[in-house]
Amino acid sequence: MIYEKGYDTTIGEFGCIKHDQHTFIGASPDGINIDPKNIRYGRLLEIKNPCSDRKLNGIPKKIYWIQMQIQMEVWDLDECDFFETRFKEYSSEEEFNEDGTFTETKDGKMKGILIHFQGKEPIYKYAPIGLTKEEFDIWYDKQMEEKPGELNWIKNIYWYMDNYSCSLVVRNKPWFNSVVPLFQDVWNTILKERVTGYEHRKPKKKQKKTKVFK
């Protein structure tokens, strides 16, 4: 994983858990730093990969900031790294090979390969970061040998990391305490309408206007 390699840490993946007090609130972060020797130990991780070419300035959108605040409250942790990346795809294997080394572009950016398989849904296998050409060939052959029979190879995708940003977001308990009543009101409405129904929330059909020709 790029974040793990860049910050020499280990990220653990966890499922969704409920808030200790407000059990109607749950959160599942992209990961948590679990290396006790690392300065980021105990820090949450939120990853975004925007498709647009907007500048990565380290400032999360409001909805992402709220998401991270809820995650920190649920997990009772005080810090979260907001990690944004932008990847670009090479047009061909030849273009990939001509740009720098097997692991870096000419201007020092990280690059790599992933495999696109197709079954009922698309499946992507990501080669570990930093493999040599020889190590990649061994990994690649293993993926092809071990893939289930119902999966079809579609193509190899050659990529480089065009840009990235990592910024620290800290916990804001006063904000969370101020919005909990709003969350509670919404949850109370959900509980009520599970019983009474929510048909009234369906969009109303527009009545067709009858055209009158004179």
Where are these regions (language model features)?
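Accessory terminal regions of nucleic-acid processing enzymes
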Residues: 1-214
